[in-house]
């Protein structure tokens, strides 16, 4: 019997890096709402009393970026200097230029059209916005087909934020983190080993007599009651530093794209390195990573494997992927190459086809920017659909 421990973490919407992600995606949404063909690459830096927005944008619409920034920060809960940041009074600087024409030409007119003369198929006309490799993953550990450690970490982080906003624990502040360690036996989750919850709080809050009991009662225990694995003997660590009064952008500077493992699978699967937030779907860092989750989830939903990881790779300016790789870690019901061939026949992985099939030219991105882009049953994300599972089953049978 092989016993191992695996750990994943999540952060709340008030974590400085997540504030930056949400600002970048809120700006993206505002542009796509009025001009779905907007090309957007927006980065955000947030620090004590200041927000800096920079990047490259080509759009037909106008967005009051400073207003978008302030509204998002206030929605998160930073509305007073007593909390370390005030969205109403912070400084906002904006430095936005146009998308490079050298990049635009490869996206607007793909290699297949410019060089290979393939102009008949409209999906051959749009090239990938960059080179790169993207991974998607799914497994049968949870109903949403996500690894249990990251799924539980996200649930705890969402509940930590909810009890603050609903006033159940009114002295909490927006910044917070969760971490979950699961004991695996023979590759299957068997027992909850450790939960760590760190939350920013008001001054003069006693950790032992108030904060720790409240976190246990209102945040941790309701989620553990839903678990289908053993929880006896677990450890709960609340604010292990002893105090967390200074948080958010006052405690640490935040940057777009610094929580890519939280955004995906909690380290349980590989990552191509590209961040998501602030990028329109012509950037395959985002759209192809969503597509790979879609593919992997359908493979598992089809019963072809209990774990599936899919890699795709692109060359900038080229529509067709330059590589596809399927790995089921020995859990496949048929050979991996057979699943790979089925994926190729069922899914069109050219960027324009992904954008069409997943309906990505919509303002849906700000809601992805906290608590994970995948395995969100409370949200109706197109890349979480398993409607192609039956088509994969048929394709495998030939």
From Swiss-Prot:
PROSITE patterns in the record: ADOMET_SYNTHASE_1, ADOMET_SYNTHASE_2
Q: What class of enzyme is it?
A: transferase
**Nucleotide-binding is among the record's keywords:** yes
Q: Which InterPro entries match?
A: ADOMET_SYNTHASE_CS (IPR022631), S-AdoMet_synt_C (IPR022630), S-AdoMet_synt_central (IPR022629), S-AdoMet_synt_N (IPR022628), S-AdoMet_synthetase (IPR002133), S-AdoMet_synthetase_sfam (IPR022636)
Q: Can the keyword ATP-binding be found in this entry's annotation? A: yes
Residue positions annotated to bind ATP are 15, 175-177, 243-244, 252, 258-259, 275, 279
Q: Name the Gene Ontology molecular function terms of this record.
A: ATP binding; magnesium ion binding; methionine adenosyltransferase activity
Q: Which reaction does it catalyse?
A: L-methionine + ATP + H2O = S-adenosyl-L-methionine + phosphate + diphosphate
Function, as annotated, reads: Catalyzes the formation of S-adenosylmethionine (AdoMet) from methionine and ATP. The overall synthetic reaction is composed of two sequential steps, AdoMet formation and the subsequent tripolyphosphate hydrolysis which occurs prior to release of AdoMet from the enzyme.
Q: Kindly give the NCBIfam families that the UniProt entry links to this protein.
A: metK
The protein here is known as: S-adenosylmethionine synthase 2
Q: Which organism is it from?
A: Frankia casuarinae (strain DSM 45818 / CECT 9043 / HFP020203 / CcI3)
